Amino acid sequence: MMAKSALRENGTNSETFRQRFRRFHYQEVAGPREAFSQLWELCCRWLRPEVRTKEQIVELLVLEQFLTVLPGEIQNWVQEQCPENGEEAVTLVEDLEREPGRPRSSVTVSVKGQEVRLEKMTPPKSSQELLSVRQESVEPQPRGVPKKERARSPDLGPQEQMNPKEKLKPFQRSGLPFPKSGVVSRLEQGEPWIPDLLGSKEKELPSGSHIGDRRVHADLLPSKKDRRSWVEQDHWSFEDEKVAGVHWGYEETRTLLAILSQTEFYEALRNCHRNSQVYGAVAERLREYGFLRTLEQCRTKFKGLQKSYRKVKSGHPPETCPFFEEMEALMSAQVIALPSNGLEAAASHSGLVGSDAETEEPGQRGWQHEEGAEEAVAQESDSDDMDLEATPQDPNSAAPVVFRSPGGVHWGYEETKTYLAILSETQFYEALRNCHRNSQLYGAVAERLWEYGFLRTPEQCRTKFKSLQTSYRKVKNGQAPETCPFFEEMDALVSVRVAAPPNDGQEETASCPVQGTSEAEAQKQAEEADEATEEDSDDDEEDTEIPPGAVITRAPVLFQSPRGFEAGFENEDNSKRDISEEVQLHRTLLARSERKIPRYLHQGKGNESDCRSGRQWAKTSGEKRGKLTLPEKSLSEVLSQQRPCLGERPYKYLKYSKSFGPNSLLMHQVSHQVENPYKCADCGKSFSRSARLIRHRRIHTGEKPYKCLDCGKSFRDSSNFITHRRIHTGEKPYQCGECGKCFNQSSSLIIHQRTHTGEKPYQCEECGKSFNNSSHFSAHRRIHTGERPHVCPDCGKSFSKSSDLRAHHRTHTGEKPYGCHDCGKCFSKSSALNKHGEIHAREKLLTQSAPK
């Protein structure tokens, strides 16, 4: 009998426990309870459910089965390579199949009564020399099992061979039950589950099909025609798996609880909490408030809330259930029977109405832009989504709608990057600059997001951009950089700042109010200008020199906030800053470039007469907004000053026929006149932008401003920090459209997608071999070049792979982390341990086969 203390030895890898789990014999323990307990502990040591996610555990199981079903001639060769995941194993087999010149032999197999000749690969010579031990062939049948049960198909696992009427309760040790997978939970509930392994669309079951003891009627499910569409367009209908696993935001959860507190939903769920029709109606009601959820997601979320509620009731800290009060009202049957005439009464009774209440009815509110919305003041909160503080409501306003914010659904990193890239396109940039609350335009943005696989409503897109603006202003006001992870993208998109040449009429225009604007309004505008946040341009304008005598003007900020237009001009005091040596160099270059502008510039058309700036234009009776009220003689001057506001780029760099704004042209000229003007004083490396130099300087200074609050690890770059955070949150925002597999990095998704397309963009020029991963390609290139960049600091020996260097370094340190569980012998390489384990496997095989 194996000692339990041996299971807790440190330094053993999961492969050892996997082999022990698979080769476990019932005869080694005293009875069934000990056998089950031993298998449980071995399985947990192998799969490590406390560390790995469900997807990772499933991948380990599938990888093991995949290696088992491989042809015997290549199985040992693949196992010799020690693939860490299924994707790597598939790639190894594909590379082996496509390797030219490999001899093949034909094999005749019978498929449905017909003989088919297949080609069988011959494995490498190295793999033929390995000892082939098929685990399945040596596994003995447990004693006490009837012959009828032994005669079952070997393809059936232990779960399939069990009586379907028997349900195995989760085995609990130390108070921690082993978590069920989502698939098992759905099967136990009797729901159909059809895995989408080949990327096909969701399969629909025929009417009246049987799933276990439950009969599924297709006519009970709402048809696609009856489902409400966001903008009455068919392409908004998505399959369930497209939105599965999306994080539930705070406002979205409160909306769900407010809906469930209504009488019809509360009574129905109290009688039958698994009623799919009720959850379907809840999902439809959520959709009315801008949250796209399936009935299964609503049911799963409510089950999760119930679980956290029970934890608090059993003595866990209150933080375990953030919605304890709302759940207390529902679970304790304290919800008063309310009329079902609207969600507002239920929400107000449950205390769920938050700071985001509006004065519009949901049925009256559409996606189309209303004229009154331009004049409305949309309160922008500086708090995050988890803020519980309520904003006082206007007592004279109409009955509030619960939870205006439809942007509560979490936006992933790649989704936000795609969203900002779409907004930076010319057609959206120009249109949103003129009217940032155009709902039809946000509908087009949402449609473009849909093309990239992200499902969003127009209102969610608008709310997200407002949130990005808020976090951007926080950083500009001096808060920590991690407040706005997309600061650089927002800085390039939001700010438009002009260093204009001296102009007599310009100062007068900046200081005097426009005709049609009262002195009180002008004073109010000046006060708003003093309070406005200082914005940067898209070309690192913090480094830009202001020529002597120039007047600083700032065009209205792109996509103004709903309160009104931002400050029109810079405060003089804000221009006094500490400037580094790099900034001084930038100043000199810009001053030099400005003197050379006439040689390179080509004056384009400048007769725009439609400026949307609320500071420069007045709204007079009988005239539309945007009509000029200044004297006609100053029209050309005003237009020349308003080109940045209009987004016009009248200056063309003749060398490349590329158009720019005034400041962008100066920056572009600097890039041609002086290549990479920002030089690192430590290593001499040069950069084209000061921001890139600042990031590079952190390598020398060791500065890591982005610190993880969970584990304390620090990072130099915000992008690496965001990627690291997903380790703690478990977020995997990048989903494969073919198989549904999720990843926490976009690069991992791109590499994975190449396994479906067969694309291998990295081709070796020496031998012609192709790779789907740049790292594998780089390692292969070193075979031809002889490059060995990884040097041992102790003996100076070089290696082409970092893994080889780590294994070599253990020869100096004496570290042997891989220990044999049977004899205690330790090894510095996992491959050596695997080969050593085959010796014990052979010994056990001989012992079992020896006559007694």
From Swiss-Prot:
PANTHER family assigned to the protein according to its UniProt record, in alphabetical order: C2H2-TYPE DOMAIN-CONTAINING PROTEIN-RELATED, KRUEPPEL-LIKE TRANSCRIPTION FACTOR
Span of zinc fingers (C2H2-type): 678-700, 706-728, 734-756, 762-784, 790-812, 818-840
Stretches with biased composition (Polar residues): 508-517
Residues recorded as bearing Phosphoserine in the entry: 153, 561
Cross-link (Glycyl lysine isopeptide (Lys-Gly) (interchain with G-Cter in SUMO2)): 112, 180, 576, 652
Similarity annotation: Belongs to the krueppel C2H2-type zinc-finger protein family.
Compositional bias segments (type: Acidic residues): 528-545
UniProt record, GO biological process: regulation of transcription by RNA polymerase II
Residue ranges annotated for the SCAN box domain, each copy included: 18-100
Localization per record: Nucleus
Keyword tags: DNA-binding, Isopeptide bond, Metal-binding, Nucleus, Phosphoprotein, Repeat, Transcription, Transcription regulation, Ubl conjugation, Zinc, Zinc-finger
Domain of life: Eukaryota
Single GO MF annotation: zinc ion binding
Gene Ontology cellular component terms for the protein in this record: nucleus
SUPFAM superfamilies, sorted: beta-beta-alpha zinc fingers (SSF57667), Retrovirus capsid dimerization domain-like (SSF47353)
SMART domains on file: SCAN, ZnF_C2H2
Region of interest: Disordered: 96-182, 347-400, 502-557, 603-625
Name of the protein in its database record: Zinc finger and SCAN domain-containing protein 29
InterPro entries for this protein: Myb_DNA-bind_4, SCAN_dom, SCAN_sf, Znf_C2H2_sf, Znf_C2H2_type
Main location: nucleus
Function field: May be involved in transcriptional regulation.
Key word Transcription regulation present: yes
